[in-house]
Amino acid sequence: MSVVNNRVALKHLVSMEHLTNEEVMGLISRGSEYKAGKVAIKDNSRHFAANLFFENSTRTHKSFEVAENKLGLRVLDFNADTSAVNKGETLYDTVLTMSALGTEICVIRHPEDDYYQQLIDSPTITASIVNGGDGSGQHPSQCLLDLLTIYEEFGHFDGLKIAIAGDLTHSRVAKSNMQILKRLGAELYFYGPEQWYSSEFDSYGRYMAIDHIIDQLDVLMLLRVQHERHDGSQSFSKEDYHRQFGLTEERYRRLKDSAIIMHPAPVNRDVEIADHLVEAPKARIVAQMANGVFVRMAIIEAILNGRNENV
């Protein structure tokens, strides 16, 4: 991995922990340039990408697809439900096949934590791996689009007071963001149900009731309640969760005028956030979705740069 004259080159992108601060800022800057229409698109028609999603996805899957098409790559169709996976084919063998066919970039979402390790360690698989989300592990492209959204608003990260709120233990978005935001100098706070908090987060920030800090926040990053990863003992009624931990109208009014609200989506309306606040003036949820395309264009370009360096 390298950065030369703001040109980022990556072999893979699987975890925010593997990126330097310089690479992070380079990807954010490049995403911003794509958004502003300042980048001349090269002829990438000889490059193939495959989006291998083994969990449901709308924003990540489709924004990668849009990004790949905007860059002129050829995108291979893949549907896990109609693939050889249903005949017992492993993830490794699926990616091995894609690589053998000449696919250069595999964007993968999979329910297994760290699924990517066996792929990037393989001496046979030559495709570059972009992690579109692994279980409760990492979600680097979501983190980068979140960073772009924050940077557009404030122009820096150092000293910003940012609360990450909700289903922390099960959230790959939370883990990716807390790791890099701490490194970039942000002051982090966490809140949500105690059973969805882990002491491993203590090294990144402070666990605090939202009502004690909300009027000081620059960024309120809400997380989806991940019902699919819970057992019955962890359930709340929608009303109870919203009242205790959600962004209600009363809490919204206490935010600073300059504060912004974020959410990786999909949003459980009237659970994590009151329905009418999803598109409120302080909300940047739609902006995050739009920024996803441009950041993912920057990621794909960086992967192609890295592959060209190794030719």
From Swiss-Prot:
| GO biological processes | 'de novo' pyrimidine nucleobase biosynthetic process; 'de novo' UMP biosynthetic process; amino acid metabolic process
One cellular component term from this protein's GO annotations in UniProt: cytosol
- Look up the EC number in the record and give it: 2.1.3.2
What SUPFAM superfamilies has UniProt attached to this entry? Aspartate/ornithine carbamoyltransferase
Q: Which Pfam families match?
A: OTCace, OTCace_N
InterPro entries xrefs: Asp/Orn_carbamoyltranf_P-bd (IPR006132), Asp/Orn_carbamoylTrfase (IPR006130), Asp/Orn_carbamoylTrfase_sf (IPR036901), Asp_carbamoyltransf (IPR002082), Asp_carbamoyltransf_Asp/Orn-bd (IPR006131)
Instruction: Give residues annotated as binding carbamoyl phosphate.
Output: R59, T60, R109, H139, Q142, A265, P266
UniProt pathway annotation? Pyrimidine metabolism; UMP biosynthesis via de novo pathway; (S)-dihydroorotate from bicarbonate: step 2/3
Residues that bind L-aspartate: K87, R172, R224
Keyword annotations = Pyrimidine biosynthesis, Transferase
Substrates-to-products reaction catalysed: carbamoyl phosphate + L-aspartate = N-carbamoyl-L-aspartate + phosphate + H(+)
What GO terms are given for molecular function?
amino acid binding; aspartate carbamoyltransferase activity
Superkingdom in the source lineage = Bacteria
Quaternary structure and interacting proteins, as annotated: Heterododecamer (2C3:3R2) of six catalytic PyrB chains organized as two trimers (C3), and six regulatory PyrI chains organized as three dimers (R2).
Q: Which family does it belong to?
A: Belongs to the aspartate/ornithine carbamoyltransferase superfamily. ATCase family.
Write out the function statement from the record: Catalyzes the condensation of carbamoyl phosphate and aspartate to form carbamoyl aspartate and inorganic phosphate, the committed step in the de novo pyrimidine nucleotide biosynthesis pathway.
Q: What is the protein's name according to its record?
A: Aspartate carbamoyltransferase catalytic subunit
Q: Which gene encodes it?
A: pyrB
